Structures are given as C-alpha cells and as structure tokens.
C-alpha cells in the first residue's frame, strides 16, 4: 500500500509506541549561523565566500581556543556561574568507582536528577546518530544578562553554542562536545497575570489571562502554578519533566491538544537573545517575524529564549483517562478488530474531547491509553460502550486488561498530594532529599528516562483516511505495519477535529501545516536501556539495535 499518509518533515516531540504516556518532546534545532550572518550585507554574502572562521567552530587544542584568561573573564561576567563540565560517569570503572559515578547510577531512573546535571541529557543517544557527551563549559544562567554574555563570548571566539533547559532533545541538540552550553535550568520563575497585554500591543490586543514562565522551568512547575494553585489551564506537554521553552519552540503537543491546540499557538510573547547578543521582545506587534518563527521553528534555532508568556484557559469540570487492552485469537480476527477500532474512533472519539493514543501491537493486541476532557466518567463510559459490546459479543477477542474509564476534577490533574492519597503508584516522586513535593513523573513515562533510541519513525495520517471508503485501506496498512513493529496512533498530535479557533491559531505558527489535516500521528519507535559513555556494565548491542531499526523502517514503509 503506498502514499496514503502525509509524512512529517521532522521527528515530532514526545510520545512513542512503547507504552509511553507522552514522550515529551523533540525539537529539530539548527545552528545559530543565520543570526551570525544577519549583520553581513546581502551583496557581500552573495559575492564573497564566507571567511573560514565562519565556516567552522573552534575546538579545544586549536590555536584560537579561548585562553584561561578568556574563560576567567567570562566567569567574571556571569557572576562566577561558569562550570567546567565532566560526565559523572567519566570516573566509572568496570563496575563502579567514585562518588559521582555512584550518585549518577543511584539516580539513573530519576529525570529530575538528570535535569539538574548540566553534563547529562534525558536521552543517552541514538544508534548511528549521536551519543550524549557534555559540553566543555556551561554558563549556569540565572538571568538574561548571563545568556547575553554567553552568546557574545561564543560569537567572538567562534565556539559552538548549545542551549539546554529540560534536556529532552531526541536529536542530540541538548548537548555537544567541545561547545559552550547555555544552561537555563535556574531560570524557572513563574508569574500569573489576570490581564496581560503584549508589549507594544495596547489597543491592538485585548488583555487576557496569561502566565510568564522562565526558559528553564519544567511543565510540572507550570501546571502546579497554573492549574493546581491557580485553577486555570495552560497548554503544555504531557511529560512533566520536559522544559517549557523547548516544547513551545518545537510546536508543542500535549495530551489535550485536540481541544486546546498547540503550545506554540498559545504563545503571546517571548524574550529572546539573538546571535548578535541583543535581548529583544518578540510578539505579534514587536519583531513579529521572529515571534512567528519561534512558534515551532525549533529550539535554539533563531536565538536563546529566556522567558515566555502563554495564554491560560478555563479548566473543564473533569479530566480523565481510559485504558485497557484487547487481544485477538488470530490474524484475521486482529485485522477485523483494527477495522472496527478505526470506525469506532471516527464515529465516537474524533472530537475535541479525546486525546492520547491507541496502539496496534505485533502480538495481535490493541492497547488503549486515552485521555479525555470535558466529560464525566459516565459520559466517557457511554462513549466506549459500542466497541466493548461488539468485543464481548465475539469469542475471537479477550479483554486482557479491562477497558475502564476514570475521571477526576480537573484541578487535581497535576496535584501530587491528591495522587499520593487517592492513586498511589500513578505518579513517581523525585525521591531525593529536599526535592519539591510537586516534582512527580507519570509512572508510564519512566521507561524513557535515559533511553538509548534504536529507531523512531513517524507519519501524520490525514483525516481523509477516516472516510468510510478509506477505512479498509487504513486498516490493511496498520495490520501490515504491525507485522513488523507495533504502531501507536497519537490522536492529540494531529489537529483535525480540533476547534476552528485552534486550527486558525496553529496555522499562524512555523509548524508543518500537515498537522492541520491530520487526525493522528503514527509513531513507530524502539529503544534500549541507558547507554551513557563511561557507564559500567554491558555496552549497547549495536548490531541488534540496527536490526530493530530496520524492522521499524519496514513497518513505516507499510504505512507509506
């Protein structure tokens, strides 16, 4: 089967088909070269070759690498917040050696610990693509002036510059060897506004409720401030440890994007440090081109975002989820089940109430991991009744895990204390002494912490495939795909079926417009355990990883 899907031009953020609730995010970032060239006259760019110093970055050991005195001046300029980096695994022996190594191994499955280490990333690498390696130095920025100093230093000394907040980039853009890192982790202030008007937009835009968030804040901090304590909603990511700035710059899907749209579309204003070292405000009225570009143009592509202001919305009465799994006894029964699920989704779930995913496994099992908003538990159960009645009436199927709906008052969705009391085990605490009590991770996301990616394929599925005459073709393609690898349909990562206002807002971003016509994003992915250089224990089996990646390639080919 060929050409029935629209493929994305960049691997999208956050979610896998490996029983992950919502893998956070990935932004396709490019160097700051366009900014470096912005001051060169256009005629000169066209007529003369670029100077060699603009064509390459200086590395340690080369004559132009900054001297100790140069680094000392930068350290002074940033108030002492310049760090020389080394991986905590650098001192590990065949089993373990040294306090730093032991501490890193102790917290290997804790993404909050990993995010607090400037030398580590949330992903340890991708076979035949990249391996996590720390920058040479990092500026632990606490304010915009620190970022300006780092950008100027990198430009003047022709260093590669890397930006890291949450450190979730799948493409390895959260780190780079021999580079200078702008580490925004400590720029995590959050302020709520009852009536925000973007700078220069008075009389053009009506004041509206909003939240201003520092570039280093995680979404769990934003949700705690806006929802748990503030009683409102901000569109962000599903994975709680993902950084706010990176997600917005890469488009930004969350569990409820089918109703609230993309995170980037909710951006009202940003402070950005451009490659010439200027801190500027970007919004619809001031630097509108830059404002448009950072809404989905890729994290760190056009400058270093230091602060964002996002609109907030009213909460629905309820958030909730539906989970379970159905197994077919034969290939033929599985093909029929896939077709039934597609028809059921089109008739009952293809609307702004429903998000997250349904997975089709190579073991002839359909796995449901959906969320909903604006419905009661009874209404959610009623919506699923037609499919469950059909399954129960046929001996070819087994409800391996009963499909059940659960709802809770929306304000409790990210309330860690509520879950500790009423649903222990659904969230995992940051277990370090003194850690903030609101720092929790969804238990279903823990498998991604430090993961070593073997393969990650994706394709947006156009809504035209849900038409009655096209559903059989889609079912055939999904079945063929599942013979090679499991595939997850992430409905919240396609905006077809979203409210018209959210479609219009998404259209005014730099995100690939194919998302507007897609009812879901198909994701085919696989990984292995953490594989940071220097870690004790077995090394990744690269031959096996490549075999798995090839199988994923065959699976996505069945969809295309």
What are these regions (language model features)?
Residues 1-17:
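N-terminal amphipathic/basic-hydrophobic helices that include classical n-h-c signal peptides
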């Amino acid at each position: 089967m060929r050409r029935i899907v629209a493929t994305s031009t960049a691997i999208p953020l956050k979610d896998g088909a490996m029983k992950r609730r919502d893998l956070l995010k990935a932004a396709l970032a490019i160097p700051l070269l366009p900014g470096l060239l912005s001051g060169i006259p256009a005629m000169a760019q066209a007529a003369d070759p670029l100077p060699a110093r603009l064509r390459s970055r200086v590395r340690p050991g080369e004559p132009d690498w900054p001297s100790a005195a140069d680094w000392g001046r930068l350290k002074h300029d940033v108030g002492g917040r310049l760090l020389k980096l080394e991986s905590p695994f650098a001192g590990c022996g065949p089993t373990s050696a040294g306090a730093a190594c032991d501490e890193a191994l102790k917290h290997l499955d804790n993404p909050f610990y990993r995010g607090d280490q400037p030398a580590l990333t949330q992903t340890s690498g991708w076979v035949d693509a990249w391996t996590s390696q720390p920058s040479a130095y990092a500026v632990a920025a606490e304010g915009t002036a620190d970022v300006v100093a780092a950008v100027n230093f990198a430009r003047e000394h022709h260093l590669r510059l890397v930006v890291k907040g949450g450190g979730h980039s799948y493409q390895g853009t959260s780190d780079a060897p021999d580079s200078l890192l702008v580490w925004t982790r400590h720029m995590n202030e959050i302020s709520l506004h009852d009536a925000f008007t973007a700078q220069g937009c008075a009389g053009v835009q009506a004041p509206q409720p909003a939240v201003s968030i520092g570039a280093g804040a995680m979404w769990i901090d934003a949700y705690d401030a806006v929802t748990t304590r503030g009683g409102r909603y901000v569109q962000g990511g599903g994975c709680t440890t993902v950084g706010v700035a990176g997600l917005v710059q890469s488009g930004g899907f969350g569990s409820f994007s089918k109703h609230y749209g993309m995170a980037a579309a909710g951006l009202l204003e940003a402070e950005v440090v451009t490659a010439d070292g200027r801190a500027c405000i970007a919004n619809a009225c001031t630097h509108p081109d830059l404002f448009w570009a950072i809404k989905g143009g890729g994290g760190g592509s056009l400058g270093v975002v230091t602060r964002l202001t996002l609109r907030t919305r009213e909460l629905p009465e309820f958030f909730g989820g539906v989970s379970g799994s159905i197994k077919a006894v034969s290939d033929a029964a599985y093909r029929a089940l896939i077709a039934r699920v597609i028809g059921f989704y089109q008739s009952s779930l293809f609307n702004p109430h429903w998000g997250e995913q349904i997975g089709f496994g190579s073991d002839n099992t359909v796995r449901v991991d959906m969320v909903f908003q604006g419905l009661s538990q009874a209404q959610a159960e009623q919506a699923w009744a037609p499919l469950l009645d059909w399954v129960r009436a046929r001996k070819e199927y087994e409800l391996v895990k009963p499909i059940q709906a659960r709802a809770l008052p929306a304000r409790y969705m990210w309330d860690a204390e509520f879950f500790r009391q009423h649903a222990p085990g659904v969230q995992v605490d940051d277990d370090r002494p003194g850690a903030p009590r609101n720092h929790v991770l969804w238990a279903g996301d823990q498998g991604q912490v430090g993961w070593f990616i073997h393969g990650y394929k994706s394709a947006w599925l156009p809504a035209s495939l849900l038409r009655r005459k096209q559903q059989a073709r889609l079912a055939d393609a999904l079945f063929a795909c599942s013979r090679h690898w499991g595939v997850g349909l992430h409905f919240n990562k396609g905006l077809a079926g979203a409210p018209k206002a959210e479609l219009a807002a998404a259209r005014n971003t730099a995100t690939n417009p194919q998302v507007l016509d897609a009812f879901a994003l198909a994701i085919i992915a696989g990984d292995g355990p953490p594989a940071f250089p220097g870690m004790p224990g077995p090394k990744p089996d690269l031959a096996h990883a490549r075999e798995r990646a090839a199988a994923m390639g065959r699976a996505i080919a069945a969809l295309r």
